[in-house]
Regions:
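Hinge/lid segment of periplasmic solute-binding proteins
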Residues: 38-64, 130-182, 194-204, 313-314
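Extracytoplasmic "Venus flytrap"/periplasmic binding protein-like
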Residues: 90, 94-157, 189-194, 290-291
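Extracytoplasmic/periplasmic substrate-recognition and gating elements
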Residues: 93, 304-367
Length: 446
């Protein structure tokens, strides 16, 4: 991080708000802080920030506070509350010499974050987590404040995550994770690594063990694999900026892919279950499940349930008209955004930057199994030697970016996925093609 660039950015912001606080600082802050009581009790280090840089940020916060307390609300998912609270307390301690900072950490599902920010921005959180596909919606509603540290974010994170966080060349959010996707998880005592290479092999193992394979076919985030594997690709929006644009796909190939999944599910109806991804870890725990498709947010629970028998791999192949075809899925990122109507924009920006720095990303990797977007963190031995993170990173080669998706994208996919898991439905080529065409038309709102 370049000290001069931070200084220039913060001074420019301070001048804009009429605050002329000096950014020299008294050097009283340290590069390691202890989380306050009520959190996890573990230190959150900030080794990537020098004391001079912390002092500059502290003076900016002090100037914004103007002798009063700064109060901010943070939204994050339920699974991350303990870690988020610990990091929030560490942030307060880091800048305690400069201002009285009150941070409220509240549960807010990331999938609904954008809607709640847009519906009532003044009552919403100042800093919040959200998935990459919601960036366009938030930006179009002018709900996001542009990042104050674009050059630093670009230098710290992978190029792909920064590109996904940008609109028209402007960085609009702080990359938090580089793993918003899903992989195959399995019980290694029941499913061999070789069987895990193909969906047919996975079902073969499930049948032998008399146990389930679970995936959430009623969720468009997972259902999209049926279309993507057949060659359909999302390519942003049409000229109107709203209608989903697709590549020049072959409807026959897409239909063949969808039919292959439907036929395989039907043939293995006794061992296939469509359920929320939390059911995968629960199934491992109670001994009813041999394999499943789990989101990155469920990996820690899978590891807890299976221990040394936890297996992780990229999504398997599926046989389509005699050809083993790699399953293609959706891969996205999680971001932390700053509410454009925050009463304390400078402190909110520094907080968002802090929560996404290398050290905080590494703590989430260690505690939550969230793979980082930070390039240095990705290069750490911990991440490189982590089987689930390695599988998630490898899956990116076979994924479509979770960006620039229309608001109409999800419901038609969910309907298609629900249709496919009912064994009594008509899965003739003609019937499947009609469902595929209806799904695509629904996504395009035609």
């Amino acid at each position: 991080m370049k000290t001069r660039k931070i200084l220039a950015l913060l001074m420019a912001v301070l001048m804009l708000v009429g605050c002329l606080a000096a950014c020299g600082g008294d050097g009283g802050s340290t590069t390691e802080t202890q989380a306050a009581s009520g959190s996890t009790g573990e230190a959150v280090v900030t080794e990537s920030w020098t004391e001079e840089q912390i002092a500059q940020m502290g003076e900016a916060i002090k100037g914004e506070a103007g002798g009063s307390a700064v109060s901010l609300k943070i939204w994050g998912p339920e699974l991350a509350q303990d870690v988020l609270k610990s990091q929030a307390e560490a942030f307060k301690a880091l800048f305690a010499d400069y201002a009285d900072i009150n941070l409220e950490v509240a549960v807010q599902g990331e999938n609904d974050a954008a809607a709640n920010i847009i519906n009532d921005p003044k009552a919403a959180a100042d800093v919040f987590g959200f998935p990459s596909d919601q960036l366009t919606k938030l930006n179009n509603a002018n709900a996001l404040a542009e990042c104050y540290f674009p050059e630093n974010v670009t230098a710290d994170n992978t190029a792909a995550s920064v590109a996904a966080a940008s609109v028209d060349g402007k960085v609009m959010a702080y990359p938090e994770t580089g793993d918003n996707s899903y992989i195959l998880v399995y019980d290694k005592s029941l499913v061999s690594d070789e069987q895990a290479k193909s969906l047919e092999g996975v079902f073969e193992a499930c049948e032998a063990a008399k146990k389930k394979f679970i995936m959430d076919s009623g969720n468009g985030f997972f259902t999209c694999m049926y279309l993507y594997t057949g060659g359909l690709v999302t390519e942003g929006f049409e000229e109107d900026g709203m209608t989903q644009k697709f590549n020049d796909y072959d409807i026959n190939q897409v239909t063949a892919s969808v039919k292959a999944f439907a036929d395989l599910f039907t043939a293995n109806k006794d061992y296939f279950e469509s359920a929320d991804t939390t059911a995968v870890a629960d199934g491992f725990k109670n001994g009813t499940t041999a394999a499943g498709i789990a989101g990155s947010w469920n990996i820690a629970a899978v590891k807890e349930a299976l221990g040394d028998n936890a297996g992780f791999a990229i999504l398997p192949t599926i046989n389509i008209n005699g050809t083993d075809t790699q399953i293609i899925n959706m891969f996205g990122y999680k971001f932390i955004g700053v509410n454009s109507q925050s009463a304390y924009p400078i402190t909110a920006q520094i907080l968002a930057y802090y929560l996404t720095n290398e050290d905080c990303q590494m703590q989430r990797a260690e505690k939550l199994d969230w793979a980082p977007s930070n390039a240095a963190a990705q290069d750490s031995d911990f991440v490189k030697n982590n089987a689930s993170m390695s599988a998630l990173m490898a899956q990116t080669e076979f994924s479509i970016p979770q960006t620039a998706l229309a608001g109409t994208f999800w419901d038609p996919l969910a309907a298609l996925g629900t249709y496919m898991i009912e064994p009594t439905n008509d899965f003739s080529t003609e019937a499947v093609q009609a469902e595929v065409e209806a799904c695509i038309a629904g996504i395009r709102d035609e």
